[in-house]
């Protein structure tokens, strides 16, 4: 602690002792009948409200006692404690009272701390209360944060009691929003009916009073988006819909319209936010070239493709700003969290002593940003995957005595935090391999391995082995080998099987024979532990990176997003998107010359809302 800080702390401690002993106190604040002896100078130093009160020439300047109306005594006591000691013990029970008192006394620093506390501790049980509290107080930033939170988590908010305690006009305004993150309109109808039935306390006539607002609230529900069976079931379960003529008419008209042609699309209604989410192919970690816009830079945006609609969109690249210099691997967890790994950019690397594997996650709620999760001991040519709450770094090359050697090391990290921990190693050293998550297990295949376990051998042998990791036993098992030894292939899980596409390889075990670019598709069935041939690719192709996939599965179909044709000239990407329908067993080109960059690092599939992504540039410049 420096001398200046120590001096200030000593002064506060002495003033606080004098306040407790009522020495040299020159004013007594009274709130709710409780008296608080204080020093005018201290009050004026922390509160512009008191400074004006004690210097404006009015009677408070000379009065010994000042009564503060509409000021809770517990909140005032805590604010005085903060003035004299800097201690401010915020809790869920006292934070709103303290923030109101700080707002009235113009103590902006305390008010800001209260807002930060409420934002940090916001959840589905209190966000509605915080929103209306902040709106009534005029705290716009807090109100905006709370409103975004409750809209994003509206499905969970509906399960709580806060939403049932709203006034009719408040609920109606909330249900009018297009921005509610609900996947089905049935949940909106359900919360309306629960609100009508809700009777707080022992108020027997409350349900009748609430039923008067039912026609008005039903008009906020987008009934054409509700299934006809659900509409009929709701009418059977809720007599309030039957006894009110207007409600009955609204429901019968909705059922009749839906029954006329159940296959017809609903009449034009704007979908709510959560209804627009869709599975997207994300080509993450792009290079800068390939897309030029006159006014907007797409260098730091990554290409996305929506197979169901054919739309092209762009997501912020993890290379944006000073994040990752390049992306080496990525995975989408079972909870739809987009995680990538790689190295820091040059500017950040200059400020760090050690080079590490850096892990970043896409922040969907703060769209356009990536947040740092963890750092692991450096390796390259590894695979990244996830099971449950854990990330896994598998194999690759690690530094040993100033040289990089292929390793069998596997490390695990919990998304809840903590250190990286070693787990069961691979049965052999492996690099440039592929990993697939399926049915709660990890499958590692292909890649390159040393000729023997001697660390000075060249890593010039490709692998055709398939390894399975069981997290319950923490063991690796070797399964049936592939027909081809290979690397630079893509591997995905589809319909309970593993599809391995293309790559560079040779037939059988690699003993140094000729290698060539493959158009082969191999399919593994885990139930019978056997491989079968799949429909060959239209031409031999390679992934864009040595160990990262360029394929993904959406709605039961397999997609390949950009690739290199053949091994001779793989410096130019073919920007086509291939599709395989496993039932038809035929490859088709669904997008030619897609608006993607000249290269990217890894293809992932995630469920995202197009509203949070960028559209293609309207001012595209031909290169």
UniProtKB/Swiss-Prot annotation:
Residues 25-92 form the BTB domain. Residues 127-236 form the BACK domain. Keywords: Kelch repeat, Repeat. GO terms for cellular component: Cul3-RING ubiquitin ligase complex; cytoplasm. GO terms for molecular function: ubiquitin-like ligase-substrate adaptor activity. SMART domains: BACK (SM00875), BTB (SM00225), Kelch (SM00612). It comes from the Eukaryota. Kelch repeats lie at residues 390-440, 441-496, 498-551, 557-607. The keyword Mitochondrion does not apply. One of its GO terms (biological process) is proteasome-mediated ubiquitin-dependent protein catabolic process. PROSITE patterns: BTB (PS50097). Pfam families: BACK, BTB, Kelch_KLHDC2_KLHL20_DRC7. InterPro entries: BACK (IPR011705), BTB-kelch_protein (IPR017096), BTB/POZ_dom (IPR000210), Kelch-typ_b-propeller (IPR015915), Kelch_1 (IPR006652), SKP1/BTB/POZ_sf (IPR011333). PANTHER family: KELCH PROTEIN, KELCH REPEAT AND BTB DOMAIN-CONTAINING PROTEIN 12. This is Kelch repeat and BTB domain-containing protein 12. It comes from Danio rerio (Zebrafish).
């Amino acid at each position: 602690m420096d001398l200046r800080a120590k001096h200030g702390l000593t002064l506060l401690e002495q003033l606080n002792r004098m306040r407790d002993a009522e020495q040299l106190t020159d004013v007594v604040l009274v709130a709710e009948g409780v008296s608080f002896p204080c020093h005018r100078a201290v009050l004026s130093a922390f509160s512009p409200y008191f400074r004006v009160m004690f210097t404006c020439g009015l009677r408070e300047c000379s009065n010994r006692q000042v009564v503060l109306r509409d000021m809770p005594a517990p909140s005032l006591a805590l604010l005085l404690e903060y003035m004299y000691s800097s201690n401010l013990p915020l809790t869920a029970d006292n934070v709103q009272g303290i923030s109101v008192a700080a707002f009235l006394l113009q103590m902006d620093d305390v008010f800001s701390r209260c807002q930060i506390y409420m934002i940090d501790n916001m959840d589905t049980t209190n966000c509605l209360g915080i929103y209306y509290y902040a709106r009534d107080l005029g705290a716009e930033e807090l109100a905006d944060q709370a409103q975004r939170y409750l809209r994003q988590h509206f499905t969970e908010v509906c399960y709580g009691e806060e939403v049932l305690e709203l006034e009719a006009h408040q609920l109606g305004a909330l249900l009018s929003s297009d921005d509610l993150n609900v996947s089905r309109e049935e949940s909106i109808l359900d919360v309306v009916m629960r609100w009508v039935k809700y009777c707080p306390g022992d108020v027997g006539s409350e349900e009748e009073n609430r039923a008067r607002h039912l026609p008005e609230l039903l008009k906020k529900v987008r009934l054409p988006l509700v299934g006809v069976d659900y509409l009929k079931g709701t009418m059977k379960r809720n007599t309030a819909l039957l006894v009110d003529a207007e409600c009955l008419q609204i429901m019968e008209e909705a059922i009749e319209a839906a029954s006329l042609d159940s296959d017809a699309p609903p009449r034009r209604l704007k979908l709510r936010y959560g209804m627009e989410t869709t599975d997207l192919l994300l080509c993450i970690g792009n290079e800068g070239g390939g897309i030029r816009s006159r006014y907007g830079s797409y260098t730091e945006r990554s290409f996305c493709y929506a197979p169901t609609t054919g739309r092209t969109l762009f997501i912020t690249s993890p290379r944006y700003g000073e994040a990752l210099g390049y992306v080496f691997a990525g995975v989408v967890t079972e909870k739809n969290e987009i995680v990538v790994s790689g190295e820091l950019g040059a500017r950040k690397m200059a400020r760090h002593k050690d080079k590490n594997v850096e892990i970043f996650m896409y922040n969907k709620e703060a769209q356009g940003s990536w947040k740092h999760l963890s750092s692991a001991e450096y390796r390259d040519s590894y695979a990244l995957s996830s099971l449950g709450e854990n990330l896994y770094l598998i194999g690759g090359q690690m530094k040993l005595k100033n040289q990089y050697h292929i390793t069998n090391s596997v490390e695990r990290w919990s998304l809840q935090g903590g250190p990286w921990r070693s787990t069961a190693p691979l049965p052999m050293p492996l690099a440039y391999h592929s990993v697939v998550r399926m049915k709660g297990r990890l499958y590692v295949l292909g890649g390159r391995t040393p000729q023997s376990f001697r660390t000075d051998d060249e890593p010039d042998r490709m692998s055709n082995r398939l390894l399975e990791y069981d997290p319950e036993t923490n063991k690796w098992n070797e399964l049936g080998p592939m027909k081809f030894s290979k690397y630079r292939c893509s591997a995905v899980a589809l319909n309970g099987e593993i599809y391995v596409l293309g790559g560079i390889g040779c037939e059988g075990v690699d003993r140094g024979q000729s290698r060539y670019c493959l158009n082969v598709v191999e399919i593994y069935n885990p139930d019978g532990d056997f491989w079968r041939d799949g429909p060959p690719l239209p031409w031999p192709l390679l992934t864009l990176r040595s160990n990262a996939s360029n394929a993904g599965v959406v709605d039961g179909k397999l997609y390949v997003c950009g690739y290199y044709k053949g091994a001779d000239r793989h410096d130019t990407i073919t920007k086509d998107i291939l599709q395989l329908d496993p039932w038809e067993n035929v490859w088709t080109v669904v997008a030619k010359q897609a608006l993607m960059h000249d290269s990217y690092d890894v293809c992932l599939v995630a469920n995202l809302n197009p509203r949070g992504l960028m559209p293609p540039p309207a001012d595209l410049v031909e290169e």
